[in-house]
Amino acid sequence: MTHHTVAIVQYPPAVLDLRASVMRSVAHVTEAADAGARLIVFPETWLTCYPAWAFGMAGWDDAEARHWHARLLAESPVLGATADAADALADLRAVAANRQVTVVMGLNERSNTGGTLYNSILTIGPDGSTLNVHRKLVPTHSERIIWGAGDAAGLRAIDTPVGRVGGLVCWEHWMPLARQALHASGEEIHIAAWPETSDIHQVAARSYAFEGRCFVLSAGLYLAVEDLPEALREPFRIGVGPEAPASGLLFDGGSSVIGPDGHYVVEPVRGRPGIVLAEIDLSALDRAHHDLDVVGHSARNDVFELRVDARRRDGVVVRRD
């Protein structure tokens, strides 16, 4: 089967409330599944919001910045215990299994020891299990005061019932070697996770689809001022900057679906919350590869070689033998 319905969730999370956000995600997955979607995608750090307020606060030994960073840590899930009662995402896994859908969730991932956050993409299979976790390789610019650097353990496409799915976070789309690693893993559907989707982000998503000869689900966050706690509204406005989309909105969505020719299947949806749906046909990929295959007949493997260390980098390796 090559025809599939896919969906992007363009609703706001419950900011800094992990439990409430998970329950919202269950409702949104249910809505998308009711509409026929078999792959359901959320934007960058949807759990539990992109922390733009950090860019509007003092970053060094500032009590307010420390307070909100601690809140973000406390409301960010630790991944890895799919069957454990303490798994904060158990309800999301359950709805994925119940509806037999694949869910791709952007989230703030907390390390299982210490207090580091990662900007991650979690892929949950239709049995509720973790299929992949990709951690953003290099947090962009001032994001480095929030997130640690990821590794290449999740830099791959994985098999799902709707095709081979991979993803990158925001400015990773301007990392040519990361793109090539995903192309080489046989990616058919690419998740481009963003907080905002300005014109240049749309250029990157469309270019990725054309280069990789794949479908791209470009997921943008929808967030209004009233979605934030009162104390975070002004720092968030400062963090977003002067290009906030409209009065009352901080991020206006802009989610889209792009075909392997780089043209829109669904043009950017801006200024309203909802589920963005699209029908895709994977047989289009073979036709698109007729004139471009960046890891095949358009490549020069005798000239260029890319090496990727795909080990999970935990820093401390303990041997007891």
Where are these regions (language model features)?
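Conserved hydrophobic/aromatic positions in well-ordered beta-strands
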Residues: 7, 122-124, 256, 276
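Active-site beta-strand/loop signature of hydrolases that rely on acidic residues for catalysis
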Residues: 29-58, 96, 103-104, 172, ...
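Extreme N-terminal starter segment of soluble prokaryotic enzymes
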Residues: 1-8
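Active-site catalytic loop in hydrolytic enzyme cores
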Residues: 81-84, 89-90, 94-97, 101, ...
